[in-house]
Amino acid sequence: MILPSFRDTADEALAVAAAAEEAGVDGVFCYDHLWPMGQPERPALAPFPLLAMVARRTERVHVGTLVARIGLVPDQVLLAEFGALSVLAPGRVIAGLGTGDRKSAAENEAYGVPPAPADERRAALGRCAVELRDRGVEVWVGGGSRGTRLVAEDAGVVVNLWDVPPAAVAEQASRSEVTWAGPVPGAGPGAIADLVAGLASAGATWAVFAWPVPLATMVACARATAPGR
C-alpha cells in the first residue's frame, strides 16, 4: 500500500505501516512528490526519511518508493539514498523509479530543478535501474510512457503501471514482469475483490493500493488469489 505521506507529521504513516505489517501486507510505499499533485499549498513528507523510520520499526514488510523521480536529485545522491535504505532494511527495499512528466514538472520548477529533456531522463533512468539491479535491489520503473517501459524492459527490471485495466497489465506481462498501483475502487469489497482477481489473472505480481485502504479486505482478496488457492 502507499502510505499517507501528504501530512505535516509522520505519525499517521508510521501507524499505517505498523498496521500493514501486522495485517500481513507485503509492502509499503511512499510517493516522491514535493506536494500533492496540483496542490502546492499542502505538505509532503520526503520519502527516504519516512521509509527509513518505517524500516527501523518493522521486520518483514518491504519498503519502497513509488516512484523516486530521476533528476530531482543527482543520480549518485539517489543511488546513495537507496543504499542507505538497504542497510536499514536489507532485502526489503523496492526501488521504484520514474522520469516524471508534465504533471510533476511544476514541482521541479518551483524548487529550481528544471527537468532535463525526456531522452536524457530516460537515459539516466536506465543507468540507475541497472546500477541498483546489479546491487541486488529490486527495481520497478513507472511505465507511464512506452519510452520508459522500453527502458525497463532493456534493463530487465519490473514495469509498474498506474491505475490501468487488467487488459493493459496482460499486454505488458507478455514483455516483462509487471506490477500495478492505483486507488482503491469505490464500489466496496466486491469491486476490490474483482480488481485483485483480474490483475492476478492478467499477470500482475503486486497490486499496490493508495491510502486509504481497507486492510482486512485487501489482504483477504490477495490471499484468495495467491498461487495454490
Model-derived segments and spans:
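Active-site-adjacent structural elements that line small-molecule/cofactor binding pockets in enzymes
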Residues: 1-229
